[in-house]
């Protein structure tokens, strides 16, 4: 298995890149989130990789961060999700956005990714629940994102709201919001419903 590649970036043709490692050029497919953060051609690049061996090809997928690669691997475990769809998901949203969509069970957010319909989105939400890691929680950018969402959710449930109502209200909480402010915003959203 090829787990990491370090070399000179020779070509960039979305979503493919070519990396020269000691005279050998590796074609690597990358999600757009990685592609946009690559250095200029001719510069050094280091990618974490996932090698997929098929009957007719050996395909190499590259990522700049460990969470991107681990999320890609989790997506591949889902029935009906291949490497292309997993790459499309990571190209259409960040790992933090995907984690937030899973935590909030936001199928509408996933259906905005090209190639993901309602049924596929629901299957992704169901099978990814609890698998993306605590460090990739729902409120992207917050100091401890998963703790904030969990605390807000628990507070709303303790106040008598159903988990479904609480999850719908948490969707209105912007990234980086603290627990007390998140509870206030969620309660405002619930009072309007």
UniProtKB/Swiss-Prot annotation:
GO terms for molecular function: ATP binding; four-way junction DNA binding; four-way junction helicase activity. Residues 144-193 are annotated as: Domain III. One of its GO terms (cellular component) is cytoplasm. It is found in: Cytoplasm. Keywords: Cytoplasm, DNA damage, DNA recombination, DNA repair, DNA-binding. CDD domains: UBA_RuvA_C. InterPro entries: DNA_helicase_Holl-junc_RuvA_I (IPR013849), Hlx-hairpin-Hlx_DNA-bd_motif (IPR003583), NA-bd_OB-fold (IPR012340), RuvA (IPR000085), RuvA_2-like (IPR010994), RuvA_C (IPR011114), RuvA_C_sf (IPR036267). It holds the Pfam family RuvA_N. Residues 65-139 are annotated as: Domain II. Residues 139-143 are annotated as: Flexible linker. Residues 1-64 are annotated as: Domain I. Homotetramer. Forms an RuvA(8)-RuvB(12)-Holliday junction (HJ) complex. HJ DNA is sandwiched between 2 RuvA tetramers; dsDNA enters through RuvA and exits via RuvB. An RuvB hexamer assembles on each DNA strand where it exits the tetramer. Each RuvB hexamer is contacted by two RuvA subunits (via domain III) on 2 adjacent RuvB subunits; this complex drives branch migration. In the full resolvosome a probable DNA-RuvA(4)-RuvB(12)-RuvC(2) complex forms which resolves the HJ. This is Holliday junction branch migration complex subunit RuvA. It comes from Burkholderia mallei (strain ATCC 23344).
């Amino acid at each position: 298995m090829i787990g990491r590649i370090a070399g000179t970036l020779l070509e960039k043709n979305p979503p493919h890149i070519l990396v020269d490692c000691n005279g050998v050029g590796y074609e690597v497919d990358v999600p757009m989130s990685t592609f946009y953060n690559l250095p200029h051609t001719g510069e050094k690049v280091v990618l974490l990789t996932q090698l997929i061996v098929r009957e007719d090809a050996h395909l190499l997928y590259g990522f700049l961060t460990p969470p991107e690669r681990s999320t890609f691997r989790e997506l591949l475990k889902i029935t009906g999700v291949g490497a292309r769809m997993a790459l499309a998901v990571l190209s259409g949203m960040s790992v933090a956005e995907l984690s937030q969509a899973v935590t909030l069970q936001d199928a509408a957010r996933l259906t905005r990714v090209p190639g993901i319909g309602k049924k596929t989105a629901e299957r992704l939400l169901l099978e990814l629940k609890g698998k993306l890691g605590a460090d990739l929680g729902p409120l992207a950018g917050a100091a401890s994102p998963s703790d904030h969402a969990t605390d807000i959710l628990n507070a709303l449930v303790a106040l008598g709201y159903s988990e479904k109502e609480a999850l719908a209200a948490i969707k209105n909480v912007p990234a980086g919001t603290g627990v007390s402010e998140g509870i206030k915003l969620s309660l405002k959203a619930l009072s309007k419903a």
